[in-house]
Amino acid sequence: MCLINIEPDKKRKGFREFLLRRNPSKSFADKYILYLSSRLVKRIARQVSEHDDIYSISTVKQLYDIYHLTKCESTNIRLHNIYSGVISAYIKYINGTELRKMVMHKDDRNG
């Protein structure tokens, strides 16, 4: 079930509930919500859509684009790995597939 077409506020609340089911720590959930509202994520969301709020994104392809652009951002690799992990968790909430857990085909890894 894909949740991409529900209202942004419902996505935000649903994602928070999703996070709390994975880890019952409210500070953990709040930190993930904060990461999704960061300047970096807003800037990249604006690059791929007319929205600067990731919860307003209307296609899964745009979410994938945000994920990949965040992952490729090279100014602070460690920080962008954290952000891309949060975006991956959000994508899992939206459509059930977490990008960080996807297994690459053997031929893809070898170039």
Residue map of PLM features:
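Classical N-terminal secretory signal peptides
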Residues: 1, 110-111
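Hydrophobic transmembrane signal anchors and adjacent membrane-proximal interface regions, especially
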Residues: 1-6, 57, 104
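Short terminal alpha-helical segments
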Residues: 2-29
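Short, charged hinge/linker segments at domain and secondary-structure junctions
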Residues: 95-109
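Non-catalytic DNA-binding core/recognition domains of DNA-processing enzymes
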Residues: 21-98
